[in-house]
């Protein structure tokens, strides 16, 4: 229900304390309410690929959409708009007025921990995808919060690192997606990044925030990332409206003190409070549910399945190995991801899904008459798999005292698995700063043998099985990457177990502040977390041998493996581009035997090294596909969906080939963006370095022809009448399909060093066999402009510009040109 209040009246009549209270959150997810003036609290919620609601722990299940790079791989404005609508509806069901997304940072390195959250390495593609999903979300009444402005392109020391970037690269690459969003979508909120830009944290950097409000004439609510406010005076004066989360750390009484010292003006407080009230007024129009609920509807499942299938990129299909005929009699499914799909990355993307379809179940459904052989082949987990389906009667008890003391039970919560994240958990009487918990449950293994147990913790924890201590993770802790970079490495123990016998599992847990570990540059959300995993101990060589055996028996083999949220997550970056240990050996062994009938399906949010790619006939990139991961992959493998995804980022042969390789972590608190504007394909093309798969690459089960000459009209660029490129495209193959045509602009005669070409438009066209259509791609002023650092303005340089239309950045199929007759400078959007 819309809150009925007049902003001017409220601002003129509320107390100074109320004004100041508005400028920070009331708790982890809400803004402050002023009931006397009918100003309600506004609920915000993560995350980039689904709506978690207000609880990391014991939350309401949610729809899980494919990850950001998967959505970027669709190159589909309409699908992204539909995805935004679904996210908006999920927000409404969770009682949330404001979605904390989308993420539009740049994948300058394949190692970035949150690379999977963003859409693309190209700023134009990223901005257009963001615009589409924002407009979809905000059509439901929910406000979108585009993030993280700007330069949070890696996780290493993200709160402390000073990103050193030239003004030109900042404008042309890293700010451009936000600029497109400001021009085309103007969402209601913007979230600042944790890091510094050129010496000053963005959250308190007036030059950076003035770009948004003054240069782009866009006036969103500007909020901090969670615990990403570092000062009172500087952040207020720079333009930060809302410190999140609450309770405040840098506002409240500190603003009062700064006012008394005349370090913050009354007009500044009024301006920030007005912006929060305007945000509340707009957000409160969203018809949110009074309670957090689910909405797992058939039409949402169908959309999620379409999103997943359309995101899948067919990287190789030598000899038309795919699609696999549904008449196949015997098929081998190999890989850790076959029965345990990777549906999302970690961190803010984590949520409790309504369901997750595995590839195994999807293949069983698609091939009811086939014999299906399965072997894991090699484990791909970094942390042992959480105990869930073999767990029963599990609860967690909360106390303010450790287990060795007499203590009072404060709360009991049921749990469905042995992982918990308590950053936002609270209970009456619980001391959030220091508390203890005991998880107890019954574990019934399905296989006899020696079992491995692994315990990772942010805090301290000890594992007991039938009251025998199996793991002590309390005293000799080593920092790892889990839980936003605050957790320990996994401590491992073993125990001999019998199938069908029930064992008592007990975890004695101490909250975050019981841990002696300290770290710089990572976010301390508090509360604490733990992950207990378990699996049967297996000999790696025997696992590979078992996999090779079933591959030898099968007519076709599908190997599905890759990364998961253990490897790609907020809070840390990957150390290398490699697949998990043992995976390459598994794939190579299967290819040695059956390369002519084996398809490799990789799940990751960003590129991984594929040393066996030249020997594989069929390679599919399936990303993190959300709830419908298994269905989406199976739909493509068996030809129910003709693959149409295109890579939204370049796929290097080796991590050392990446332009950010020498500058991908904080060194002494600084990180130099030394590649300047030559990021991604711009770098590979400029230096002539080969990649494994180029930006924009993706194959189809059909073929297309495109007219070699693009008609560009008008031939002279005018800001009043910018040109449009038109080409004729025809489906020359046997099945219906979609082609994504990518428009690149080259300025070969420019006096200023520029990339060989840059993406400035694209279109996706669906055609039946034999159908042809003329498609148009519009060209805007960004296509001819670069940032002139001397004039501190955009410069559209006179000269002839080449129009290059391709099916990837390397496959140019049509050409045209236009000219700019007079150099001009401009600012704004």
UniProtKB/Swiss-Prot annotation:
Residue numbers annotated as active site: 225
InterPro entries: Cellulose_deg_GH3, Fn3-like, Glyco_hydro_3_C, Glyco_hydro_3_C_sf, Glyco_hydro_3_N, Glyco_hydro_3_N_sf, Glycoside_hydrolase_SF, Ig-like_fold
One GO term of the biological process aspect: cellulose catabolic process
Stretch forming the signal peptide: none
Domain of life according to the entry: Eukaryota
SMART domains: Fn3_like (SM01217), PA14 (SM00758)
EC annotation from Swiss-Prot or TrEMBL: 3.2.1.21
Catalysis: reaction(s): Hydrolysis of terminal, non-reducing beta-D-glucosyl residues with release of beta-D-glucose
Domain PA14 residue range list: 389-548
GO molecular function, one term: beta-glucosidase activity
Entry keyword set: Carbohydrate metabolism, Cellulose degradation, Glycoprotein, Glycosidase, Hydrolase, Polysaccharide degradation, Secreted
Major place of residence: secreted
One of the record's GO cellular component terms: extracellular region
Location in or out of the cell: Secreted
Similarity field: Belongs to the glycosyl hydrolase 3 family.
Protein name: Probable beta-glucosidase H
Taxonomic lineage of the native organism: Eukaryota, Fungi, Dikarya, Ascomycota, Pezizomycotina
């Amino acid at each position: 229900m819309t809150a009925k209040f007049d902003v001017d009246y409220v601002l003129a009549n509320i107390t100074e304390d109320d004004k100041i209270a508005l400028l920070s959150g009331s708790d982890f997810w809400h803004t402050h309410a002023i009931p006397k003036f009918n100003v309600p609290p506004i609920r915000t919620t993560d995350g980039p690929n689904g709506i978690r609601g207000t609880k990391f722990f014991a939350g309401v299940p949610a729809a899980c959409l494919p990850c950001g790079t998967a959505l970027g791989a669709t190159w589909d404005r309409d699908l992204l708009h539909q995805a935004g609508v679904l996210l908006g509806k999920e927000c409404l069901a969770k009682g949330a007025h404001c979605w904390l997304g989308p993420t539009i940072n740049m994948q300058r390195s394949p190692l970035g921990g949150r690379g999977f959250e963003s859409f693309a390495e190209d700023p134009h593609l990223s901005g257009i995808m963001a615009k589409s999903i924002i407009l979809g979300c905000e059509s439901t009444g929910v406000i979108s919060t585009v993030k993280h402005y700007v330069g949070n392109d890696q996780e290493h020391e993200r709160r402390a690192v000073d990103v050193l970037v030239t003004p030109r690269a900042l404008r042309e690459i890293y700010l451009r997606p936000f600029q497109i969003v400001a021009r085309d979508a103007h969402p209601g909120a913007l979230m600042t990044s944790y890091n510094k830009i050129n010496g000053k944290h963005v959250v308190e950097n007036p030059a950076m925030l003035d770009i948004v409000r003054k240069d782009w004439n866009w006036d969103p609510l500007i909020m901090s990332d969670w615990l990403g406010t570092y000062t009172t005076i500087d952040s207020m004066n720079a333009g930060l409206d809302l410190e999140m989360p609450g309770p405040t750390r840098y506002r409240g009484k500190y603003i009062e003190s700064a006012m008394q010292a005349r370090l913050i003006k009354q007009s500044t407080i009024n301006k920030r409070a007005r912006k929060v009230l305007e945000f509340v007024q707009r957000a409160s129009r969203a018809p949110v549910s009074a309670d957090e609920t689910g909405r797992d509807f058939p039409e949402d499942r169908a959309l999620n399945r379409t999103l997943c299938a359309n995101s899948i990129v067919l990287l190789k299909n030598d000899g038309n190995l795919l699609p696999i005929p549904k008449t196949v009699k015997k098929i081998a499914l190999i890989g850790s991801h076959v029965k345990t799909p990777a549906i999302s990355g970690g961190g803010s993307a984590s949520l409790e899904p309504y369901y997750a379809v595995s590839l195994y179940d999807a293949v069983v459904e698609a091939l009811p008459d086939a014999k299906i052989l399965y072997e894991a082949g090699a484990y791909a987990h970094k942390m042992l798999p959480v105990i869930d389906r073999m767990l029963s009667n599990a609860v967690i008890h909360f106390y303010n005292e450790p287990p060795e003391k007499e203590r009072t039970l404060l709360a009991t919560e049921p749990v469905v698995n042995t992982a918990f994240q308590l950053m936002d958990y609270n209970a009456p009487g619980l001391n959030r700063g220091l508390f203890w918990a005991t998880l107890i449950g019954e574990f019934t293994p399905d296989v006899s043998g020696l079992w491995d147990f692994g315990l990772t913790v942010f805090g301290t924890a000890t594992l007991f099985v039938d009251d025998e201590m199996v793991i002590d993770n309390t005293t000799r802790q080593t920092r790892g990457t889990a839980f936003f970079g605050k957790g320990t490495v996994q401590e491992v123990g073993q125990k001999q177990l019998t199938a069908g016998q029930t064992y008592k599992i007990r975890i004695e847990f101490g909250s975050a502040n019981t841990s002696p570990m300290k770290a710089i540059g990572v976010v301390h959300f508090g509360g604490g977390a733990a992950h207990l995993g378990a699996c049967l101990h297996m000999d790696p060589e025997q696992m590979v041998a078992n996999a090779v055996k079933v591959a030898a028996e099968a007519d076709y083999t599908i190997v599905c493996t890759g990364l998961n949220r253990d490897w790609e997550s907020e809070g840390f970056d990957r150390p290398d581009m490699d697949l998990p240990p043992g995976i390459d050996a598994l794939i190579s062994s299967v290819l040695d035997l059956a390369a002519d009938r084996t398809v490799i399906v990789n799940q990751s949010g960003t590129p991984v090294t594929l040393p066996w790619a030249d020997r594989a006939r069929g390679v599919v990139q399936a990303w993190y596909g959300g709830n419908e991961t298994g269905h989406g992959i199976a739909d493509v493998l068996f030809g129910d969906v003709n693959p149409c995804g295109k890579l939204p980022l370049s796929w290097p042969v080796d991590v050392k080939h990446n332009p950010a390789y020498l500058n991908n972590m904080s060194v002494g608190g600084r990180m130099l963006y030394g590649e300047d504007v030559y990021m991604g394909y711009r770098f590979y093309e400029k230096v002539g370095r080969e990649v494994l798969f180029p930006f924009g690459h993706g194959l189809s089960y059909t073929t297309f022809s495109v007219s070699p000459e693009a008609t560009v009209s008008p031939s002279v660029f005018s800001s009043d009448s910018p040109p449009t490129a038109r080409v004729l495209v025809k489906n020359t193959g046997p099945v219906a399909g979609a082609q994504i045509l990518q428009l690149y602009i080259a300025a070969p005669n420019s006096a200023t060093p520029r990339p060989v070409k840059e993406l400035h438009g694209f279109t996706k066209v669906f055609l039946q066999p034999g159908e042809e259509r003329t498609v148009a791609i519009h060209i805007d002023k960004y296509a001819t402009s670069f940032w002139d650092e001397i004039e501190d303005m955009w410069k559209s340089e006179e000269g002839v510009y080449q129009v290059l239309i391709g099916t990837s950045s390397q496959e140019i199929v049509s050409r045209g040109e236009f000219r700019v007759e007079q150099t001009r400078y401009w600012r704004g959007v």
